[in-house]
Amino acid sequence: MASGGSKSVASILLALNLVLYFIVIVIASWAMNHGIQRSREAASVLTTPARIFPIYFPMGNMTTGFFIIFTLIAGVVGFTTSITGLNNIFQWNAPNLDAAAMSSLTTWALTLLAMGFACKEIELGWTDSNLRTLEIITIIVSATQLLCTSVIHVGASEVTLQRIARV
């Protein structure tokens, strides 16, 4: 009975994370494309060390490049983890839940790294509305990924205990 509750909560959280990570990918991809297109003209007026630096974005502040790159990586990994996690949750056996738990933990670690850059970007300021949206969604998805990781770990331990009790 308890594993059914964990299964439904994990499915809902994985579906929510799938949507949130897709939004993160779309906004971070737009920001990356915008930065690549505008960096040549914006960086031409800078001094030599700043022109050579490959992670210069004409919007935001000095953490914007790192924030966008790590958010894009976390978004792609999180989207993939959510898709495979839904498959693993629907099968609901120990090996699949262990795989879902480990990939969920890895995704949460990457999302926390992106969230750290989001917090630094918020602290420094000077960001436009698109970057503020990406920062907020990154912070929200790190919290939902923590909940999802916790629920999957609870479900994996329940299935393992049930398997041990049967033997």
Please name every model-derived segment.
Residues A101-S104, G125, S129:
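Short amphipathic alpha-helical interaction segments
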Residues S3-V24, A28, G60-A118, E135-G155:
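Signature of small four-pass
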Residues M1-L14, I23, H34-I55, W126-V167:
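Intrinsically disordered terminal tails
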Residues C119-E123:
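Juxtamembrane "helix-exit" motif on the non-cytosolic side of transmembrane helices
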